[in-house]
Amino acid sequence: MTKKLTLKRKGKEPEPTNEVAASSEASDNEEEEDLLQAVKDPGEDTTDDEGIDQEYQSDSSEDLEFESDEEGNYLGRKKGDGSSEEEDDDGDEEGEEEDEEEDDSEDGESADDGDEEKPTTSKQNKSEDEPSSSKVSKKTQPPTKDLVKRDPSHPEYHDSDTSDEEDIRNTVGNIPMHWYDEYKHIGYDWDAKKIVKPPQGDQIDEFLRKIEDPNFWRTVKDPQTGQEVLITDEDIALIKRIISGRIPNKDHNEYEPWVEWFTSEVEKMPIKNVPDHKRSFLPSVSEKKRVGRMVHALKMGWMKTTEEVEREKQAKRGPKFYMLWETDTSREHMRRIHDPVSAPKRDLPGHAESYNPPPEYLFDERETKEWLKLKDEPHKRKLHFMPQKFTSLRAVPAYSRYLRERFLRCLDLYLCPRAKRVKLNIDAEYLIPKLPSPRDLQPFPTIESLVYRGHTDLVRSVSVEPKGEYIVSGSDDKTVKIWEIATGRCIRTIETEDVVRCVAWCPNAKLSIIAVATGNRLLLINPKVGDKVLVKKTDDLLAEEPSSDVIESERIKAAVQWATAEPAEQEKGVRVVINHFKPIRQVTWHGRGDYLATVMPEGANRSALIHQLSKRRSQIPFSKSKGLIQCVLFHPVKPCFFVATQHNIRIYDLVKQELVKKLLTNSKWISGMSIHPKGDNLLVSTYDKKMLWFDLDLSTKPYQTMRLHRNAVRSVAFHLRYPLFASGSDDQAVIVSHGMVYNDLLQNPLIVPLKKLQTHEKREDFGVLDVNWHPIQPWIFSTGADCTIRLYT
């Protein structure tokens, strides 16, 4: 239920005529005094702090109605007809300004008329109202001062910075109004009552207002009260001037004429032309006396010259020297050096540097050999010296490296820059990449299952049949042996004239051919194992010599000659012999089984040769030598040819006959390489204990460098079906790793070392010489210097 409070305000009457001015003004004064006495308490002071009477006048004759809830909170104002204050303000905003101007003009005219007739009316009132005591008391009150009419074009506080007298309806102060977003009220009025937020319309109401209300574009919301305020024409003009970059005050003239307070033209006549005084050109008596006193002081020695004063200051300063190193107790800021960083101190000597160290600190034969082996890499040594033992201190000789170590220490002090760095507290486990557990990456070989014994010298190479039933091995004992994988039995042994450097089984399952590199000859052998139909088909293919209409150049004839094997060799299974002019080191097959390539490191620009089996002809792909070729490889999908020199790997397009890419290994010597079955990743082994993984689509530099071995890595191999690769090294270890290559090009390969298989024996610093995967099963074969071939499953 709402309460209503009605306060009637006295309206302005029509302007009185001259005849009745006195009577009308008298009656008006009496009515105003009665109304003020009704509102004010008896004896209440009507003056403000400065002693000026305050008059409360109303500018409307209408009734004011205020609404409040049961708690007394202010809700709004209504007119006499029951309409809310908001509805009345929206409809009459435009007419209020005109009404105020008319009211002001009427008030001014009525006040002027009243002043003119004031003496007459005061006399009449005094004579008529003498019997009334109440009226006499009213007349005895001090007369109220007339209100000065203010120009509406100039605000009341136009020339003042004060804001204490502003019309503030919400007393919360200058705070963010969004603090009241969750409340029903928006603040408190002067009576400490809540100001309820006005009703908010929805988007439909706002859309209708945009269409129907012509003043919608100039209506803003007051954040203090939540009411909507209509922007006047003066405010719009001010906003436009600010947006256009002009001075907000339109009465200000920024192009006023310049007033020259002092002329810029040189005047001919001086401002003052007073003749010089006589004392301006006569010697000064005071200066004469001062000079006399100074001369007397110099004679008596009381006063010193500038040179003497400078010498005394120099003597007080002392020599310009400073400490090279700071003391332990004070921190000295040296000249031209801001906050220097002290040099690191040498480590204190330990027990190993004693002239009579304990026996456990002395090197044994193995430690001495390792210490001497790191001569080229002294930073990897645990100690920069070799501990020695003496019977007494007088038996200790002079340290031969003392001067060199002092010299290197001095170089470190003045050549190596020193800086302060904030130590980062980073957990070491955070830096380690999260790798899956090896148990989740099975299957992979974990144990040694079979050992194939039969060779009497180094077994340099091993190759597996495409169906995975047999393997072939080549050794320095000049024999080629064919083994059955399941039983470990040697089925056939083929003797050769020279050391067998490399063997390779043809990857085409429709042919049964083994390429054997022995000395200067490349032998194509039919092993006569497996399917008899396949063996017979292979013999028929190799027995036919195709007709060749192409005339080979003398350069090719001098490098290679094709020939049919002798009858004695035919019995061993040799069908075709390809003679080279230099020893062959490596032989590799193309994926289709028709092409094979050989490498002769001593052949200069003819080191690499490509042979075609079906046409029995050879070709030299390179006319110039780009380095000492170590090994070659065919791309499994594209017509590309990989050539590895000592330091780099070049990829050539055989169709376009151009260089496609050059891979930078940053290694001392490349030993071998293997390509992923998909052809996008390459694995390279080096003699400097590294394995390099190249992503051919990513960069010409290694994607990852793996240092898993302690000695030279001699061979690497990818599995054809499983995401596995392996490496063999001279440390007698075969390390099996997981290498998953994803079809998503945005995802990097996953490389996880899985198992270290170390069962080979070391002979003459050689360990594992070759590794090769089973084509179907996750098994791996390794050959070593211990004359054995080992199978890990």
Curated annotation (Swiss-Prot):
Its main location: nucleus. Residues 117-129, 146-161 have a biased composition (Basic and acidic residues). Pfam families: BOP1NT, WD40. Keywords: Nucleus, Repeat, Ribosome biogenesis, rRNA processing, WD repeat. Residues 1-11 have a biased composition (Basic residues). It is found in: Nucleus, Nucleolus; Nucleus, Nucleoplasm. GO terms for molecular function: ribonucleoprotein complex binding. It comes from the Eukaryota. Residues 133-143 have a biased composition (Polar residues). The keyword Metal-binding does not apply. InterPro entries: BOP1/Erb1, BOP1_N_dom, WD40/YVTN_repeat-like_dom_sf, WD40_repeat_CS, WD40_repeat_dom_sf, WD40_rpt. GO terms for cellular component: nucleoplasm; PeBoW complex; preribosome, large subunit precursor. GO terms for biological process: maturation of 5.8S rRNA from tricistronic rRNA transcript (SSU-rRNA, 5.8S rRNA, LSU-rRNA); maturation of LSU-rRNA from tricistronic rRNA transcript (SSU-rRNA, 5.8S rRNA, LSU-rRNA); regulation of hemocyte proliferation. Residues 1-168 are annotated as: Disordered. WD repeats lie at residues 454-495, 497-535, 579-621, 624-662, 665-704, 708-747, 763-793. SUPFAM superfamilies: WD40 repeat-like. Residues 44-53, 60-72, 83-116 have a biased composition (Acidic residues). Required for maturation of ribosomal RNAs and formation of the large ribosomal subunit. Belongs to the WD repeat BOP1/ERB1 family. This is Ribosome biogenesis protein BOP1 homolog.
